[in-house]
């Protein structure tokens, strides 16, 4: 199926992204033209710089740009869940303002692997990342495959991004509060629902401006808490004691 026959919602949580936001939205909107219908939902997560002002200006230029605002910083995971509840189109993707996924790749990726219920994007490499970031990413992969060996046997990278059917997202809606586990939880829930899950390797664009919070000890602890909680939940699902 061609992108011109597909409707897509793109979610983008942002926090103090005044340096990135205009370029990110301009590039994303160019790619949106390739789709039958597309919307970009930006969640301003309590920014205290000029991010909100720039978003307001951009929303005048782009009618399919929806700006949501958190009055305080609540984190990526909660912002994503907020955005997921607002999507209108058939497929859903999330990206960051620093564009780790180049918007120009979106249509090509979808057409390569269509049809699917969930398409997991896996990073080709970790070039130019710090040793700490590489260690955390590799350690995270190992831990996930220890806790969920069968469900993740064919998935190497659960912490980049994905493209998912809206109907499946509603059934696999996450409870995670950690940005490091929310995507993994959705993937696992989709697997337990026997969804058609595919993977594709894509180029990862390293962040150039501002800072990312992935790899901070507090976020790692939240991630472990989410992981253990969902592992217990998944055992009950497998045993038939609890539903999704």
Where would I find each of the regions flagged by the language model?
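A conserved acidic beta->alpha catalytic loop
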Residues: 44-53, 99
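Short loop->beta transition adjacent to catalytic acidic/histidine clusters or analogous donor-positioning motifs
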Residues: 6-8, 29-41, 50, 63-66
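Donor nucleotide-sugar binding loop of glycosyltransferases
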Residues: 17-20, 47, 76, 102
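Acidic helix N-cap motif at the loop->helix transition within catalytic regions
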Residues: 19-23, 49-58
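Conserved donor nucleotide-binding strand/loop of the catalytic core
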Residues: 38, 52-86
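Acceptor/aglycone-binding surface of glycosyltransferases and processive sugar-polymer synthases
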Residues: 70-86, 91-94, 103-180, 207-215, ...
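Short, well-formed alpha-helical segments that are part of the catalytic scaffolds
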Residues: 17-31
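Hydrophobic helical membrane-anchoring modules
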Residues: 1-6, 147-152, 175-244
């Amino acid at each position: 199926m061609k992108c011109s026959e597909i409707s897509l919602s793109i979610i983008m949580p942002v926090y103090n992204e005044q340096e990135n936001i205009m370029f990110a939205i301009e590039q994303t909107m160019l790619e949106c033209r390739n789709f039958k219908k597309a919307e970009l939902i930006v969640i301003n997560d309590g920014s205290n710089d000029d991010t909100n002002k720039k978003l307001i200006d951009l929303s005048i230029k782009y009618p399919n740009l929806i700006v949501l605002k958190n009055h305080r910083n609540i984190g990526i995971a909660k912002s994503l869940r907020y955005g997921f509840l607002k999507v209108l189109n058939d497929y859903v993707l999330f990206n960051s303002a620093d564009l780790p996924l180049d918007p120009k790749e979106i249509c090509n990726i979808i057409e390569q692997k269509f049809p699917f219920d969930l398409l997991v994007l896996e990073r080709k490499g970790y070039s130019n990342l710090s040793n700490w970031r590489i260690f955390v990413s590799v350690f995270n992969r190992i831990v996930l495959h220890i806790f969920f060996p069968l469900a993740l046997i064919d998935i190497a990278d659960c912490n980049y991004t994905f493209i998912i059917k809206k109907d499946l997202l509603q059934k696999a809606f996450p409870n995670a509060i950690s940005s490091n586990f929310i995507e993994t939880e959705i993937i696992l829930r989709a697997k337990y629902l026997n969804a058609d899950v595919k993977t594709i390797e894509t180029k990862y664009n390293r962040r150039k401006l501002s800072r990312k919070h992935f790899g901070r000890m507090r976020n790692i602890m939240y991630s472990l808490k989410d992981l253990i909680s969902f592992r217990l939940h998944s055992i009950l699902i497998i045993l038939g004691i609890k539903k999704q």
